[in-house]
A protein has these predicted regions:
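An extracytoplasmic/periplasmic, membrane-proximal ligand-sensing/linker region
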Residues: 43-45, 229, 280-341
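Short, low-complexity disordered leader/linker segments with a strong preference
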Residues: 1-43, 155, 340-341
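N-terminal (or domain-start) structured segment
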Residues: 37-128, 167-169, 175, 191-220, ...
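Solvent-exposed, polar/charged alpha-helical surfaces in well-ordered, non-transmembrane soluble domains
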Residues: 63, 67, 71, 92, ...
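Short, surface-exposed alpha-helical segments at coil->helix boundaries
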Residues: 59, 63, 180, 184, ...
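Hinge/capping helix and adjacent helix->loop/strand transition within the periplasmic-binding protein
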Residues: 96-102, 109, 117-204, 253, ...
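C-terminal lobe and pocket-closing loops
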Residues: 138, 224-293, 327
Length: 341
């Protein structure tokens, strides 16, 4: 009896075609649920972890953006404050969460860019442990002094500091905090010597500057704006490239004409990140919602009134910012010899 033959195609070829077809079915079977899940996102409450105490800039930003996410998607957004260790405890919680888009971190320059250089045993990697979602806002630091200090501008301050090396103190919200590094960067740029006094939080540092226990602070605008407006502190300059809309009478440090401050910028910034491995479709969807919310008049006005500048951008650009800021602040940490408490 003649062997079985298929006209035009051999048995071996048929088996190869069958294997390829089955492989394709497996791929489609695996990919389909993930694709459908991404399309259905979000379908349950989203949690934004703020790694600081309630009431500060990150908390205000998280709640403002969370409200807009709810309006756009119909799902509730829960803001949870998990403070401690300079924000690294809350950040680590998000790094270890499921990468499904339902747990986000309101990241900060401190937790995402400064911490790797200050904390040698950091439990997460700011680049490898997270997926960038959306840069939310930049917050200029305001250089403010006690009202009785005999200086009216940055040039006079630098002259005073050089005439009195080591006799002027400044406060920050803690050793290795963003405000600490900003002032160290200012010191390096102006070649001045100012003594650092670390506090447990920004508020007591600001209040001691008002009381005259220390002479200076260089910290986020929201913390000092009320004291400047009431005349209890003198604002000499802001760390941003442009003047703030809400306090346009305060010049930028770059405008001071002081040698070393040309092009000076040391803003704080805040943005949402998700656990690494979160599907790109989800991070892109969140990015679009956040960017649209930042362009809304009500939220833009609210953020600016708090001293924050809306800063919508792509996840890719936000990722590049994080990486460049890690390098930048590492150089400051090394040169200043800053270590965690």
């Amino acid at each position: 009896m003649a062997g079985l033959k298929c006209p035009g195609i051999g048995i071996e070829n048929m088996l190869n075609y069958l294997k390829r077809f089955l492989a394709l079915l497996v791929v489609l079977f695996i990919a389909a649920p993930a694709a459908m899940a991404d399309d259905a996102y979000p379908n349950k409450p989203i949690r934004i972890i703020v790694p600081f105490t309630p009431g500060g800039s990150p908390d205000i930003l998280a709640r403002a953006v969370g409200q807009k996410i709810t309006e756009a998607t119909g799902v509730s957004v829960v803001v949870e404050n998990i403070p401690g260790a300079g924000g690294t405890i809350g950040a680590d919680r998000v790094a270890k969460a499921a990468p499904d888009g339902y747990t986000l971190l309101m990241g900060h320059v401190g937790t995402l860019a400064v911490a790797p250089s200050v904390y040698p045993q950091l439990p997460y990697d700011p680049v490898k442990s997270f997926a960038a979602v959306a840069l939310v806002a930049k917050v200029p630091n305001i250089l403010a002094v006690n009202a009785s200090m005999p200086v009216k501008n940055v040039a006079e301050l630098v002259a005073y500091l050089k005439a009195n090396p080591g006799k002027v103190n400044y406060g920050s919200g803690g050793n290795g905090s963003a405000a600490h590094l900003a002032m160290e960067y200012f010191k390096m740029s102006t070649q001045t010597f100012i003594v650092h006094v670390p506090y447990r939080g920004t508020a007591p540092a600001v209040m001691d500057t008002v009381a005259g226990q220390i002479q200076m602070v260089f910290t986020g605008a929201p913390a000092v704006m009320p004291m400047v407006k009431s005349g209890k502190l003198k604002a000499l300059g802001v760390s941003s490239v442009k003047r703030m809309d809400t306090m346009s009478d305060i010049p930028t440090l770059a405008e001071s004409g002081v040698k070393g401050l040309n092009g000076f910028e040391a803003d704080q910034w805040y943005g949402l990140v998700a656990p690494a491995g979160t599907p790109v479709a989800i991070t892109q969807k969140l990015n679009q919602v956040v960017n649209k919310s930042l362009s809304a008049q009500d939220i833009s006005t609210r953020l600016r009134s708090e001293g924050a500048i809306p800063a919508p951008t792509t996840p890719e650009n936000f990722e590049q910012l994080i990486q460049s800021e890690i390098k930048r602040w590492r150089a400051v940490v090394i040169k200043a010899g800053i270590k965690s408490e």
